[in-house]
């Protein structure tokens, strides 16, 4: 061990492992255009096998950087979780619930399926962001969170435009609206 350092592994608290293939893809765009015009259309074409393979690539990258656990949000949790299990990697997973790819019953099913599934895996409730979820969807998720006594995770106030548009829609910031 001469000249080396032994320390606990790092934890990455915000990952989207399956999105490794999008690194540097149209990254000169503002977030809303990048998501709506580039990311969401590309993700719609992904198969579970591709999501699994991209997640394995991400996990290999995490490990080479000293990251031994992550908190991952993705719309297709099954292949991400399988990649984590197959790689022996600790993952806290949350779904990317939104109005166009997932439903509250699917999130509940994942919560029940993956908590206790494997010692390396846990699943938390989550949604993508205020601007991709209707009020009704958020209320349904809130009811589920209360039923399960579980926390809820999301992206919040990532850009000035997001905050301004939420204030325009609801007369309050995303943080106040989501409270």
Residue ranges and their predicted role:
Residues 8-20, 151-160:
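Histidine-centered catalytic micro-motifs
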Residues 18-19, 32, 175:
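A general structural signal for well-ordered alpha-helical segments in protein cores
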Residues 79-179:
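Metal-coordinating catalytic core of metallo-dependent amide/deamination hydrolases
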Residues 16, 75, 97:
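Flexible loop residues that form catalytic
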């Amino acid at each position: 061990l001469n000249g080396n350092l032994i320390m606990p592994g790092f934890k990455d608290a915000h990952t989207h492992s399956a999105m490794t293939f999008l690194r540097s893809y149209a990254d000169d765009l503002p977030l809303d255009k990048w998501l709506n015009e580039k990311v969401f259309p590309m993700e719609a074409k992904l198969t579970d096998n591709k999501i699994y393979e991209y997640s394995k690539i991400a996990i290999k990258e995490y490990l080479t950087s000293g990251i031994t656990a992550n908190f991952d949000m993705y719309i297709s949790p099954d292949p991400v979780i399988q990649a984590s299990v197959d790689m022996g990697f600790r993952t806290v997973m949350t779904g990317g619930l939104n109005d166009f790819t997932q439903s509250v019953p699917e999130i509940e099913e994942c919560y029940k399926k993956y908590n206790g599934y494997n010692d390396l895996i846990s699943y938390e409730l989550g949604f993508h962001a205020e601007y991709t979820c209707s009020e009704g969807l958020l209320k349904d998720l809130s009811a589920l969170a209360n039923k399960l006594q579980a926390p809820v995770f999301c992206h919040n106030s990532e850009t000035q435009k997001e905050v301004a548009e939420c204030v325009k829609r609801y007369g309050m910031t995303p943080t106040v609206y989501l409270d």
